[in-house]
């Protein structure tokens, strides 16, 4: 079983800053200490994967009800994430901080604690996600035009992100994507790269 949280979705279930486990694989016992064996035992007893997913969702909802109410810090981060996502990661962190009415440093501290990474890095991920969703997977691609449209300074800036997130340059990535796509059924372009969870 696995859980994919939104960028600010995991914090209510943890008692420590997300920066301590960001982009890492950690044992369930290290994350949920006292609950780990309880949930593990319950999941082993279910008859099917579907039943396990239902059980796990119920378990998460119960834990969520036990957590304190949403804080001002969580509201700030939620607002910032929504603004970044709406602008596909192109909104400057300084402008965002000014909109919210807090310093960039304070916003950075909140993001490290509640999201696990910096606001700048999350914006970078949203911008790259926008690139992947903007690319035609069946027609020729003008990478320079894509870079400009998605808020990159130039093509080398886009290439740097491609290599960082996928291990390939844009052309090789698209070639691989087209090879593994079959007929009219195209794979989700995000499935071919390892973006830190959103």
Model-derived regions, located:
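DNA major-groove recognition helix of helix-turn-helix
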Residues: 111, 123, 161-162, 174
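Major-groove DNA-recognition helix of helix-turn-helix-type DNA-binding domains
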Residues: 114
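Intrinsically disordered, low-complexity sequence elements enriched in Ser/Thr/Gly/Pro
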Residues: 2, 122-125
């Amino acid at each position: 079983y696995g859980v994919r949280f939104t960028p600010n979705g995991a914090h209510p279930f943890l008692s420590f800053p997300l920066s301590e486990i960001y982009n890492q694989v950690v044992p369930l016992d290290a994350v949920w200490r006292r609950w780990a064996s309880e949930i593990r035992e319950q999941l082993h007893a279910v008859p099917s994967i579907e039943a396990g997913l239902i059980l796990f969702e119920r378990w998460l909802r119960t834990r969520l009800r036990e957590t304190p109410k949403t804080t001002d810090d969580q509201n700030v981060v939620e607002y910032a994430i929504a603004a970044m996502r709406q602008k596909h990661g192109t909104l400057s962190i300084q402008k965002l901080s000014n909109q919210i009415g807090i310093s960039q440093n304070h916003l950075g501290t909140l993001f490290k604690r509640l999201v696990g990474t910096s606001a700048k890095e999350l914006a970078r991920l949203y911008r790259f996600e926008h690139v992947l969703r903007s690319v035609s997977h069946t027609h020729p691609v003008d990478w320079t035009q894509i870079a400009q449209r998605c808020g990159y300074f130039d093509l080398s800036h886009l290439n740097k992100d491609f290599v960082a997130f996928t291990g390939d340059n844009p052309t090789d990535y698209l070639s691989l994507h087209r090879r593994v796509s079959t007929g009219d059924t195209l794979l989700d372009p995000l499935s071919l790269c390892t973006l830190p969870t959103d």
